[in-house]
Regions:
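C2-type phospholipid-binding modules
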Residues: 234, 242-247, 414, 522-528, ...
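Exposed aromatic-hydrophobic patches
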Residues: 511-522, 550
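Short coil-to-beta strand junction motifs in C2/discoidin
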Residues: 471-484
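Short proline/glycine- and polar residue-rich coil/turn motifs
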Residues: 504-511, 552-555
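Short Trp-Ser/Thr-centered turn/loop motifs at beta-strand boundaries
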Residues: 495-507
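Long, acidic (Asp/Glu-rich), low-complexity accessory segments flanking structured domains
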Residues: 1-21, 33-178, 184-401, 405-473
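Hydrophobic beta-strand segments
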Residues: 6, 74, 461, 483-487, ...
Length: 610
């Protein structure tokens, strides 16, 4: 490769080196002095380019002889990381990541082996214990946040977009545990699914149920809820019931579980492998129920997004065959928290985002209490015709379980949803904090200055560097990104906060910041942390490059790599951030974060920070 060809290569991988440094590095690696790099020289050039001086600095802080890490040196590092600091674990890491035979034989780790280890999944910022199902799955359903999709069949907007089975497959493969089916009378007696009174296309109900049968439990063994928005005639409701029974077979829950109170909610563990129907139930079908066959909140949702002047009377009669498939998730109109408290836990109310927000502002504590007993479903405003999303965190703060989002619309709100359900094996159920599950809780999401859920901690995050950031897809091939990093806290209102690093000019390959932020997190059990990288632009809005969101309680302290994700939530490998994290007791409770340097020491012990 000539020098000009090397420059083209650097541009392709988003590296903008100064002319002086690029030529100096080229000449250093051109050992044959023929103004070209052969295969071996290209390898040396890339190795020099890929050097991680910030990792070398960490390595040297722990190396007793500045050459290698002994098992004792590595043990000290692991201790400061808050990990298993046994010599046996240190030895196993050397055997796994050290490629130099002499070093491995003598139980040493070289800088290259250390880099391999630091870049491995073993050093991810997400607690590996939380990557599996680790929570108690035997609580009632109301004690869990449940990953939920709104108008699952839509591929785009709410008025003209196509309906398809593909969004069901994607949602189920991502661990979604509540999908929505808007059911209407179709031709030849076959019910269809589409967004009623709009120009969205129609798909047969039977096709969706067949897809659900195939994909329901591929990503999670825990119960799947079918949220039926029923606008069908009694005759086609009966067809729906027959198709549900014949296709889903014994996966479909058709009666209360034996040995359990039929008026209490079972647990995800009790309902493993079962599909539940959420819908209205015939009046009096469940003793003590306040359910009626009148228009429910869910039906109101459909009317709010329908084309004006194209309304039809809502269905007021229910098919007994379909009604009897509704067991633990009976849709009812919400009257008041006091009224709901007297009714069975198997009743479920749907709230528009605006109604839910009003209840949170006016009666936050009572909404949390309600959600310790019954399920609540939240759906987007009918004004969101382009399928935009509301902030799900506000609803989780009140303990709402079924917070339905438009999965087809990527963005910050879906990042938060993916982050919320990243833990617990991505099974679609995460256990709510204990203070949200007590019937008499005094937790109020609008005020966590004290009382339940208030256990402030100091979160210190040091953004050290990034690696191999992509260019925005629409950028010119010759452009180089100017990255900056946001660190965001999403949680109780008192905790919502974000800070950004300065931008680095013309370096998406290995930008260095070494910038430290302090945050006080008052309700850590509710908080999410979002790392977001964007391309700074002086003349227009900044372009999104990548992000990663996870529960605050799933963070690992120490030096970690944050593996960035694309806007659609898929992997952006090898793009990552290199960070240092500490979480410690909070001596004071400032409501805003501060920025300073250098970083605090890790909480587990005193670290040798660079």
């Amino acid at each position: 490769m000539s020098y000009e060809e090397v420059q083209t290569l650097l541009q392709m991988i988003n590296v903008d080196l100064s002319e002086q440094y690029a030529r100096s590095l080229f000449q250093k690696c051109d050992r044959s002095a023929d103004s070209r790099l052969d295969h071996e020289e290209i390898e040396i050039f890339c190795r020099e380019l890929l050097r991680r001086p910030e990792l070398d600095t960490v390595f040297l802080r722990y190396s007793a002889n500045d050459c290698v890490l002994s098992t004792v040196d590595l043990r000290d590092f692991l201790k400061d990381q808050g990990e298993d600091a046994s010599l046996l674990h240190a030895q196993s890491l050397i055997l796994t990541y050290e490629l130099n035979e002499w070093a491995q034989k003598n139980q040493f780790m070289t800088p290259n082996g250390f880099t391999m280890y630091m870049l491995s999944k073993e050093n991810c910022v997400l607690n590996p214990e939380h990557a599996r199902v680790y929570q108690d799955m035997t609580h009632p359903l109301a004690h869990y946040f449940i990953s939920s999709s709104h108008n699952t069949y839509l591929t785009k907007d709410q008025l003209t977009g196509d309906s398809s089975i593909e969004p069901y497959i994607r949602a189920l493969n991502h661990g979604c545990r509540c999908v929505e089916l808007d059911c209407w009378d179709g031709d030849k007696g076959e019910p269809v699914i589409y967004h009623g009174h709009t120009l969205t296309s129609k798909i047969p109900f039977v096709n969706v149920i067949e897809v659900i049968k195939e994909y329901a439990f591929k990503a999670s063994p825990y119960p799947l809820i079918l949220s039926l928005e029923n606008h069908c005639s009694v005759e086609q409701q009966t067809v729906m019931a027959q198709q549900l029974r014949s296709i889903l077979g014994d996966k479909l829950l058709t009666k209360p579980l034996g040995g359990l109170d039929p008026h209490s909610l079972p647990s995800p563990e009790d309902l493993k492998g079962k599909i539940l129907v959420k819908g209205k139930k015939e009046h009096g079908a469940v003793e003590g129920s306040s359910s009626t066959s009148e228009l429910s909140s869910s039906d109101e949702e459909a009317s709010r997004t329908s084309k004006k002047g194209d309304q039809k009377p809502s269905v007021s009669k229910l098919s007994p065959e379909l009604s009897e498939l509704v067991v633990y998730t009976c849709s009812v109109s919400f009257k008041s928290f006091e009224h709901a408290a007297r009714n069975p836990a198997t009743e479920l109310s749907s709230f528009s985002e605006s109604d839910a927000t009003r209840h949170i502002k006016d009666s936050g504590m009572y909404f949390v209490r309600h959600n310790s007993h019954q399920l609540s479903r939240i759906y987007p405003s009918g004004q969101r015709l382009q399928s935009s999303n509301y902030n799900p965190q506000e609803m989780w703060n009140a303990g709402c379980q079924i917070v339905a989002l438009n999965f087809q619309t990527p963005g910050e709100q879906m990042d938060l949803n993916q982050g919320r359900f990243l833990q617990n094996g991505q099974c679609g159920y995460t256990l709510k904090p204990p203070f949200m599950c007590q019937p008499g809780t005094t937790f109020n999401p609008e005020n966590v200055g004290g009382g339940p859920g208030h256990r402030p901690v100091l979160f210190t995050v040091r953004i050290i560097s990034a690696q191999q950031l992509p260019k925005p897809e629409w950028d010119k091939p010759s452009s180089i990104v100017d990255p900056q990093v946001w660190v965001e806290i999403h949680g109780a209102p008192i905790d919502n906060n974000k800070k950004k690093t300065p931008h680095i000019d013309n370096n998406g390959f290995n930008p260095q910041w070494d910038c430290t932020f302090n945050f006080t997190v008052h309700a850590p059990d509710l908080a999410l942390v979002r790392f977001m990288v964007e391309d700074h632009d002086y003349t227009s809005s900044n372009d999104f490059l990548g992000q990663y969101t996870l529960p605050f309680t799933s963070l690992r302290t120490g030096y970690r790599h944050v593996r960035l994700l694309k806007v659609d939530g898929s992997t952006l490998s090898p793009a990552s951030l290199f960070v240092h994290i500490t979480v410690g007791p909070c001596e004071s409770s400032p409501s805003k974060s501060s920025t300073k340097s250098p970083a605090r020491s890790p909480t587990k012990s005193s670290a040798k920070g660079p």
